[in-house]
Amino acid sequence: MPEQAVASASPHHPQAHGAGLAKLALGAIGVVYGDIGTSPLYAVKECVTLPHGVAPLAVNIYGVLSLIFWPITLVVSVKYLIFVMRADNDGEGGVLALMALVARPSAAAVTADESGAHRASTRTTWTGLRKTKMLLIVLGLFGAALLYGDGVITPAISVLSAVEGLEVATSAFSPFVVPITCVILVLLFAMQKRGTGGIGAVFGPVTVTWFVFIAAAGLPWIVRHPEILRAMNPIYGARFFILHRGHGFLVLGSVVLCVTGGEALYADMGHFGTRAIRLAWYTCVFPALLINYFGQGALLLERPEAAANPFYGLVSGAWLYPMVILATLATVVASQALISGAYSLTRQAVQLGYLPRVTIVHTSGQTEGQIYVPEVNWLLMVACVALVLGFRESSALADAYGIAVTGTMAITSMLFFFVARDLWKWGALRAGALLAVFLCFRSEEQTSELQSQ
């Protein structure tokens, strides 16, 4: 069975700087960060809502915020942006890129600091692979399957949850929730032929506006209760587990919602490049998310009764309805990250010989990684619409969503260990220590998700 393409560490965007880099960063905000950017809508709410959550007491609020702060920091800022995104397969990221790296017959050409444009490709057979590499290939393919599943579930649950917000205004909308969701999904997938660059140009400003609004909503509450920033101390997370024991472990099943979309950073690397994705995260997305999460915590310190919906509790009066409209747009945008990731995943699978040839349309003359795959696009659309028609409620999809996310991230961590040890020549202790930090946390969240079924 054909399997292999030799990897390269050269990005697709080496020339991006100045205005070009800013444009790519804007597109990355719209395409890559839509999913993780809408997590404040429900992450804190699920953590302080019974039966799986905890009561909105001060000690619990500090603990929950600590559990949210450190996963975002360790998983996104450290794991993906500092370490994992340094490993690419000819500029592409994602679980198949890692699989291709670890399955190479020779490790001579790839190091962590390599910047040359090594474009050679080779293929190998199953008989030429060691058993360990065969197992890693199977693991990588399973991770790819989970990412495809995530690409189907994310648009369905995001758009469905947004349209369900219409029921808050009046129950008269209830019969129209599913039909409206299906129409929006069809329109979303019909837009894909514009390419991620064109879509990013449309979605980018919407998502930037979203991040500005959620930061502006949270900041006044932090100013009123600056003591909430103490939750950055990990001791509060430790105390939370000591206090709640087994139930605190279950809360991790809700905490994982704050990093949904994290794998999209890596899967979409070929569309925008590492520099643009990192710039967008550190200058816009990361600060806005933290301000909003800590703002929700400060709100709950003063008004525990707001636990029913702490996100919308941050705003009131004339600002409530604009926020509802913007949130609806943002959740629709959130679908894009995994759709784009599915295109990149498909191209890699075709190049490695695991999928038959498909039509791959390059939608940008400047950015090689920006592609559109019609066959995958329409298959995803049919699958998403089928999920909506079958489940009809976003809550029915939530558990499968969390399992797909944590499973993919855990597999990425394991494959990264072998890249670091075998290709980058890190010591087993160094690579193993990093794996322990990443995989231990992901395994706890995976188990808590399964126990909450």
Residue ranges of each PLM-predicted region?
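The structured alpha-helical core of multi-pass membrane proteins
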Residues: M1-S448
